[in-house]
Regions:
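N-terminal alpha-helical modules
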Residues: 20-128
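N-terminal signal peptide c-region/cleavage motif recognized by signal peptidases
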Residues: 15-19
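Cleavable N-terminal signal peptides
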Residues: 9-10, 20
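Bacterial N-terminal signal peptides that target proteins for export
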Residues: 1-8
Length: 128
């Protein structure tokens, strides 16, 4: 019983810490960088989920390969575009991780919407 109360107290403290951390995204540069990185990670998880859903729907191996190639090229474009827009880390200072994560997240949000549209489209004329 004592163990359960200790565990409950620890979990509650952890929850409070996470809540406070979520509210501190504008506290300083490091927290802004961290929050932007977490946002990007969540978007990347959703991107991978949608990509896998579409790949599982496709029956034709050539279509699967085409989507795979498109995704690889999209990632290369996204990364190159953000390098162009944000520049190199050594040229930007402590704000660079925030700007880089925001740029990558902006592109990733758009790509997630595109993949969701593919996944939702199950009619004639949709990629199969």
């Amino acid at each position: 019983m004592k163990y359960s109360i200790t565990l409950l107290a620890a979990l509650m403290a952890l929850g409070i810490g996470c809540s406070a951390q979520a509210e501190d995204c504008n506290a300083n540069q490091a927290s802004m960088n961290q929050c932007a990185s977490q946002d990007l990670a969540a978007l990347d998880t959703e991107l991978n989920r949608q990509y896998k859903a579409q790949m599982s729907w496709l029956k034709d191996p050539a279509r699967k390969q085409a989507l795979k190639e498109a995704q690889v090229k999209w990632i290369a474009f996204r990364d190159a575009d953000c390098l162009y827009r944000v520049g190199k880390a050594e040229d930007s200072g402590s704000i660079w991780p925030l700007l880089q994560s925001q740029c990558l997240a902006e592109h990733t949000r758009v790509r997630v919407k595109e993949l969701k549209a593919y996944v939702a489209c199950r009619e004639e004329g949709c990629p199969r």
